[in-house]
Amino acid sequence: MITASLLPLPATSSSSGRRSLPPPTTTFPRPPPPLRRHRHLSSSSSSASSTESDGGGGSTNGSLPGLPPVVVEEEEEEFCPVECVTEFKTEEELARVLERAKATGALVVVDFFRPSCGSCKYIEQGFMKLCKGSGDHGSSVVFLKHNVIDEYDEQSEVADRLRIKVVPLFHFYKNGVLLEAFATRDKERIIAAIQKYTAPSSPPAESEEPSQEG
């Protein structure tokens, strides 16, 4: 009894010596990869190859070969908190700060600025860094700032009273007295002035008594 087999039959030779060919199979074309994915891989591979070439064949940013490089964000230098540089708007506010500073012997540094001033924006970052590091030197320094343009886009009463004509301008007060004022965008000049007015006073030199000969 002959039963039907579900397995393919092996190729047999015909009587004429030719092998019988297997039945033709239908093949379907492979769909191309998505264009967006292709661009992502190519850009990733190029980024990885450029990173490897720069780092001597290895990844310099922690990414594995063949994978997109890890983007490492540079840590920005930490600035002082907002309350470190206090902004005042009226002459009365400035007077209160100067009075408190007089009681503690602190130096008061005031930055007069204008929002549209490029040099003011430039020195602002350095001024904030000075404020943040002021406690490291053991000296008491109070940092203030004042916008010379009021909400009506006119010169403020404080700027008018103090005759502020140029910005950025820095005032240095101690014991309620204005010691120095100058316009600058040089942080080193501000540092020099702070050090000058916060340096401990040197003790007076002891006078030598003339030796008495007996």
Curated annotation (Swiss-Prot):
The active site is at residues 117, 120. PROSITE patterns: THIOREDOXIN_2. Residues 1-20, 42-53 have a biased composition (Low complexity). The keyword ATP-binding does not apply. Residues 1-68 are annotated as: Disordered. The keyword Plastid applies. InterPro entries: Thioredoxin-like_sf (IPR036249), Thioredoxin_domain (IPR013766), TRL4_chloroplastic (IPR044176). Its main location: plastid. It is found in: Plastid, Chloroplast. Residues 21-34 have a biased composition (Pro residues). Disulfide bonds join 117-120. Keywords: Chloroplast, Disulfide bond, Electron transport, Plastid, Redox-active center, Transit peptide, Transport. GO terms for cellular component: chloroplast. Probable thiol-disulfide oxidoreductase that may participate in various redox reactions. Belongs to the thioredoxin family. PANTHER family: THIOREDOXIN-LIKE 4, CHLOROPLASTIC. This is Thioredoxin-like 4, chloroplastic. It comes from Oryza sativa subsp. japonica (Rice).
